[in-house]
Regions:
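Structural signature of FAD isoalloxazine-binding scaffolds in flavoprotein oxidoreductases
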Residues: 38, 44-49, 76-94, 141-172, ...
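Short, basic and Ser/Thr-rich N-terminal targeting/leader segments
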Residues: 62, 69-71, 154, 225-226, ...
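Residues embedded in well-ordered beta-strands within globular domains across many folds
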Residues: 86, 127, 159, 301-302
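Conserved active-site and cofactor/substrate-binding residues in soluble primary-metabolism enzymes
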Residues: 4, 8, 29, 47-50, ...
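A gly/ser-rich beta-alpha-beta helix-loop segment of oxidoreductase catalytic cores
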Residues: 115-156, 227, 231
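Short acidic (Asp/Glu) patches
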Residues: 112, 142-144, 173-179
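Anion-binding (especially nucleotide phosphate/pyrophosphate-binding) glycine-rich loop
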Residues: 4-136
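Phosphate/pyrophosphate- and phosphate-bearing ligand-binding catalytic cores of soluble enzymes
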Residues: 23, 75, 161-288, 292-309
Length: 309
């Protein structure tokens, strides 16, 4: 019975995508920067808008949950995996075009690569993003930022596809950007492309700023271990890393997951951690900080799949 059903599912899918871009039971530890996570029932690599619209229609017909994966650099997938479809954009979604001070980039393009292209074109405004390890789509969805810059500050418009396959463009105001959020985080849709508006600048100055931020990052962050970057959002009026340190949690472990001693705001995969280890440590940190300081730390990381004890 079960086999027949999944056979019928994949027949339809084979009409939409070539079979080398339809992966089943794909281990998600290969696709997240935490290097943890169980199998996704489907992992679909999508290269065109037409394919995307057809896949979204198929998912809706089959009532399958789906999640759009960028670089997996802000994502914790449960050890039992995800029983829906992971969508990953490639092909035409990787393109970047620069016209004067405007950059149009596909949602699958890497933010750090776009930042580098901007520097090479003598455009300033994206320096802050040079070390952020995500895609443009993910950066827009969560309004990624670092070193006093955020993507909202340079976004002119964002094109999305709704689950019904229709495309629409949001301007900056309509994007409703906030701290680590935007309209596309709060409603189901897929970011297709983004237009960024930068300023003409001095290439060598831009490059120097990027190198300086990069050195700062290496010095202060535990880049030598798998992690999802900053694990917690910044609580109003505090710094997460300092609260965690002051709570005596530097180096605290659950299984193979550890609060980085180099930067307490980072939970790292120190040694073969599972997602349950990471989730357990996040919970331990949250509870301890709440208890000691009465401050609620909210994870910045997205949890996908099953995290029941």
């Amino acid at each position: 019975e079960q086999k027949g059903w999944s056979g019928h599912l994949s027949d339809r899918l084979n009409e939409i995508l070539p079979k080398e871009r339809i992966l089943t039971e794909e281990q998600m530890d290969r696709h997240t920067t935490f290097r943890t996570g169980g199998p996704a029932r489907y992992f679909l690599v999508i290269e065109t808008r037409k394919e995307l619209a057809q896949v979204l229609a198929w998912l809706q017909e089959e009532a399958l949950p789906w999640f759009l994966l960028g670089n997996g650099s802000n994502l914790l997938v449960g050890d039992r995996g995800y029983r829906g479809a992971i969508l990953h954009l490639a092909g035409e979604f990787l393109k970047t075009e620069i016209d004067e001070a405007t950059i149009r980039c596909g949602a699958g393009a890497m933010l750090s690569a776009v930042s580098r292209s901007a520097m090479e074109a003598g455009l300033t405004g994206l320096e802050f993003a040079s070390g952020i390890p995500g895609t443009i789509g993910g950066a827009v969805r969560m309004n990624a930022g670092a070193y006093n810059g955020e993507i909202a500050g340079v976004t002119e418009s964002v094109e999305v596809m709704e689950p019904d396959g229709r495309c629409r463009v949001y301007n900056r105001e309509e994007m409703a950007f906030g701290y680590r959020t935007s309209i596309v985080k709060t409603k189901p849709c897929v970011v297709l492309s983004t237009v960024l508006k930068l300023q003409k600048g001095d290439r060598s100055e831009i490059s120097a700023t990027m190198q300086e931020l990069s050195a700062k990052r290496r010095e202060k962050q535990p880049l030598e271990y798998p992690s999802a970057g900053s694990t917690f959002k910044r609580p109003e009026g505090y710094f997460a890393g300092k609260l965690i340190m002051d709570a005596g949690l530097a180096g605290a472990c659950v299984g193979g997951a550890q609060v980085s001693e180099k930067h307490c705001g980072f939970v790292i995969n120190r040694k073969n951690a599972t997602s349950a280890d990471v989730a357990g440590l996040i919970q331990k940190v949250t509870e301890t900080v709440q208890e000691k300081f009465g401050v609620t730390l909210e994870p910045e990381v997205i949890f996908l799949g099953d995290f029941e004890k």
